[in-house]
Amino acid sequence: MKIGIYCFLTDYSIDVAKLAVEAEKLGFESLWLPEHPVIPKFRTMQSYLKPGSEGAEELPKQYFDTVDPFVTLGKASCVTTKLKLATGICLVPERNPLLLAKEVATLDLISNGRFIFGIGAGWCKEETEIMGGNFERRW
């Protein structure tokens, strides 16, 4: 069985180098980091949860504070040799496709082929639009 770690890393959470080294030592297969460049204060869709359900009103603080997954996974690649490094997920409609292709190829190169490119389209309309995407046409 392959077991990985998924977490929101922030400036107040564990350092990714320390986490990656320990994860590899303990036999974890992969480290997955999410992407949220910006979470607007006012959102038409507070969450993918049903309105009124627990957690639907406000997102946890780490959603607002999460680090860039590509830079952070690059750091993790420098202190590990076997741990696979993954985006869980990269919000493709919010990115320039040429720059994204370069970032993905670079991370795969510096990690010696250990990068897993997890992709998605996002759930927050305002975030997508702030980042230059079209929410209705994101798929």
Question: Would you name each region that the model predicts?
Answer:
Residues L31, L85, F115-F117:
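Hydrophobic residues within beta-strands of alpha/beta enzymes
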Residues A86-E94:
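Conserved strand-turn element in the central/C-terminal portion of the radical SAM core barrel
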Residues I3-D15, P93-W139:
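Flexible, glycine-rich active-site loops centered on histidine and acidic residues
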Residues E24-K25, L73-K82, V104, D108-F115:
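Acidic (Asp/Glu)-rich catalytic clusters
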Residues M1-V79:
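N-terminal beta1-alpha1-beta2 module of alpha/beta enzyme domains
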Residues P60-T66, V79, L85, C124-E127, ...:
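Glycine-rich, flexible loop/turn motifs
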